[in-house]
């Protein structure tokens, strides 16, 4: 996806770019995760990229749990738009 489409997904009623918002960070982490996953399918022994992927997954998980605590409705909407699974602990 393109960065402008991420911004439109996040804040359709808000027309300004808010790159510090939790939703924007989750979307950008999801984009990085998808790129790293496709990279690791070709390069299975790239252990530094695997480590980076695990770190980004942890950051995204922490942000998702924060968003779920603060606003459950936005959490559900974001998960459905990004086609990612809901957290097991929720």
Swiss-Prot record:
GO terms for molecular function: structural constituent of ribosome. SUPFAM superfamilies: S15/NS1 RNA-binding domain. The keyword Isomerase does not apply. It is found in: Plastid, Chloroplast. One of its GO terms (cellular component) is ribosome. InterPro entries: Ribosomal_uS15, Ribosomal_uS15_bac-type, uS15_NS1_RNA-bd_sf. Belongs to the universal ribosomal protein uS15 family. This is Small ribosomal subunit protein uS15c. The gene is rps15.
